[in-house]
Amino acid sequence: ISIGLVGSEMCIRDSLVAGRETLENIQFIGAVGGFSNSDVLGSAKGWAGAFKYNEKAKKALDNFFTRKDTLSIGICNGCQLWMELELINPNHKRHGKMTFNDSKKHESAFTSVKIQKNNSVMLSSFEGSTLGVWVSHGEGKFSLPYNENKYNIVGKYSYDKYPHNPNGSDYNTAMMCDSSGRHLVTMPHIERSIFPWNWAFYPPDRKDKFSPWIIAFELSLIHI
């Protein structure tokens, strides 16, 4: 999904591959979950290949991430895509990868994350908050080759042991963004946790129409 100057639209990968879409008029793109290519080649590997090995698609995406007026979010499969394309820490000589959960199985669960001090456009105002959220992935482990201070970690699982940390991610990482704070990746599905009735547990004394996660998307719209 992409959000342009006059609203939102579906921006299909095939349009980028064919050169029909260049992202020039787009300011916000979301790469979302969905087990692209059925994960036959590994998580988001086939999806990433469509960008890596197609000149038109690669140019469109590279130009988008080079611009200073853009935002993006990669959720689950989209997180795996942005990490596979090395878009979050482009200056690193060794890049983090998304690898198999330590449990060696797919994990679908309701857990919680604690938002760290961060400069993320979408989540900086959440600093110190602990919020419930769904996860659903088989390759959700952030395998990070450098020390923690080399990464802009936005959110961590509230507890570092399984099953609260469902994948064994290095530094308990659940969410990360680039140095500018404009490009966010998250394995937890914040978009599946928008409504209180999405949550496995929601405080009964609260009568919210939306969960706090909606604010992240509101902030992205305000920014652009």
What are these regions (language model features)?
Residues G4, K68, I73-G74, W134, ...:
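Short conserved micro-motifs on helix faces and helix-strand junctions that flank
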Residues I1-I12, I222-H223:
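Single conserved hydrophobic/aromatic residue that forms the stacking wall/gate
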